[in-house]
């Protein structure tokens, strides 16, 4: 059977003479029209260090595809730099870009009848955007992560971009001077690669490796190391074989694969954004997955890796300690992974992990032994209560007190909140509420890294809570609760909180509660009026109109008709 199952529609027969004529102009020869055409979705961009090394990887992917007997066709996808847009109106486009990336890959691959695709991405939304497209198309596909940045260094300490965000809070609190602030800025990001802790990009790449959609070890490699380029070329060979065997995403992205991904995310201390993105991918793939599934798995899986933002190490250290395969082998041995789940190579998870040691190396403490975890349970807790009937996500790693009750400090935007923190107007015991930053209300669920980093930098990380219908960066830690649903814009209870109201965050009881009577809430709800959309044209206007609740993954194609 021919391997060009889809592309033959544009390459075979006399009627396709004009099609072949154009393909000859881009490098096809007489013998190439029976080969599978494989897309190379290249996220290269000089917008961000996360993506600036991707073109070299795309060229290696092209070379690998040609050597394996396929015809590559490269096309570009966009990216937004979360780190650069953070704290600005531009961050509203970040989650939107996930949908644009998905739409663009789907459009290019289906429009050109490609037989498969190798997607190469770096910054946060590149990963879920690509995987949503892969799930929509259900053609053989593999994801290549651009790799992590190496840590910066200053005064004997490893730095990440989060160090720079926290330095702003320290500077505002008078803890560091101009010279130290500038030194941290100059040293935080030393080269190419995605943000170096177990932030969102590294979390999602780890999840994809756990799901079998990326090659072993590839999710923790440094962007600038030769092994990353070698792994990319190997990914091309694996993909062509998957095309020949017709190994499809629907065979890999099963319920078992999602449960494996959640277990790994808990074990490595991953980002809250993984909840949103995995829900979106599952929704697209038609896999039943709810926000409650994260809580079920959280209770079973310990945090095994001592990684930033709340821990000591960065992702290259995890790679040196055995990477995601080592973590997965430990989970498999304790019955917390589905070993029979399929991977893109055609092997099962158990077969991939067969030769991995049962325990991590003794001469490191990045990956902790099973009997001495960083935390006995997972760190991403799903909270519910009258403030979040559909659920909210709390990241409780690095938190000394997982519960608090305090007066609400209410802000209608991230900017207003940050100004108050930097002006010293937030005190220990306060519960900060940032609302109208949800999928529809923002729109786009901006990440609150600037406010949370300012809180940490001011020394209030253990004594101030923050609740939002927006999101958090993977670099955030502290007593923070995001993804509150229903969001304020659609009349969720978070819209009804008044300044000074008593609010409870209790991660132990998984409770998020506004401590006012039902009668008072009913009165406030009766007087609440929906705000006008902030944008009524352009992509933000379209997004706000189409996007679903964060509890469903904030996807834009649910119940379109």
Curated annotation (Swiss-Prot):
According to UniProt, this protein's pathway is: Amino-acid biosynthesis; L-isoleucine biosynthesis; L-isoleucine from 2-oxobutanoate: step 3/4; Amino-acid biosynthesis; L-valine biosynthesis; L-valine from pyruvate: step 3/4
Query: Is this entry keyworded Lyase?
Result: yes
Binding annotation for [2Fe-2S] cluster: 50, 123, 195
Q: Which molecular-function annotations from GO does this UniProt entry contain? A: 2 iron, 2 sulfur cluster binding; dihydroxy-acid dehydratase activity; magnesium ion binding
> Positions modified as N6-carboxylysine?
125
Reaction(s) this enzyme catalyzes, per UniProt = (2R)-2,3-dihydroxy-3-methylbutanoate = 3-methyl-2-oxobutanoate + H2O; (2R,3R)-2,3-dihydroxy-3-methylpentanoate = (S)-3-methyl-2-oxopentanoate + H2O
GO BP terms: isoleucine biosynthetic process; L-valine biosynthetic process
Keyword set, alphabetical order: 2Fe-2S, Amino-acid biosynthesis, Branched-chain amino acid biosynthesis, Iron, Iron-sulfur, Lyase, Magnesium, Metal-binding
Role, per record:
Functions in the biosynthesis of branched-chain amino acids. Catalyzes the dehydration of (2R,3R)-2,3-dihydroxy-3-methylpentanoate (2,3-dihydroxy-3-methylvalerate) into 2-oxo-3-methylpentanoate (2-oxo-3-methylvalerate) and of (2R)-2,3-dihydroxy-3-methylbutanoate (2,3-dihydroxyisovalerate) into 2-oxo-3-methylbutanoate (2-oxoisovalerate), the penultimate precursor to L-isoleucine and L-valine, respectively.
Question: Looking at the keywords, is Lyase present?
Answer: yes
UniProt EC number: 4.2.1.9
Superkingdom, natural source? Bacteria
Report the active site residues: 473 (proton acceptor)
What Pfam families does the entry give? ILV_EDD_C, ILVD_EDD_N
Q: How does it assemble?
A: Homodimer.
The cofactors required by this protein are: [2Fe-2S] cluster; Mg(2+)
Q: Which family does it belong to?
A: Belongs to the IlvD/Edd family.
Protein name as it appears in the record: Dihydroxy-acid dehydratase
How, per the record, is the cofactor bound?
Binds 1 [2Fe-2S] cluster per subunit. This cluster acts as a Lewis acid cofactor.
Annotated residues that bind Mg(2+) are located at 82, 124-125, 447
